Amino acid sequence: MIIKYNGDEKFEIKTTEAKVSLSSAGIDIEGFVISTPGEYERRGVSVQGLTLDGDQKPVYIIHTEEMTLCYPDGLNHELDEEIVKLIGDIDILFVPLGENGSMPLKLAQKFISDIDPRVVIPMLYSDIEQFKSAEGITDGEVDQLKIKKAELPVEERKFFILKSNN
């Protein structure tokens, strides 16, 4: 799978079977747009849209290439334990950072800790330095993330800061 960041809350994911776009409009699997809660499957990609605590936008759980991704666009509050269990085991977590419609640093750190993903990819940030410093991230930005299930970290969490292609 190849993940590219297109700025703000937008990502493009290329899998062996499909091109998937993530944005505030929802999940687009080659023209099949998912923007409401429910369970969907298209071209080897399954998506579960969860509505949490009356939020306007669903949190999306995406299963593809034997990996599970969580895309919580618009989430800006703490999750209770029951919701964290509902989200389940996540390999790759997209984290909305910042103040406007996303998560301040402390809330983002708690969200990451609660979900306990193997890989974290920040989004919606204007200044990433405070987050990098708080998490001890020394790696620079990368153009894209190319990853397979076998390459996921086992013992530690890995952070990837993707350069915006926009």
Predicted feature locations:
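A cross-domain feature marking catalytic cores of carbohydrate-active enzymes
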Residues: G74, L97, L124
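Solvent-exposed polar/charged
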Residues: L86, S113-D114, S133
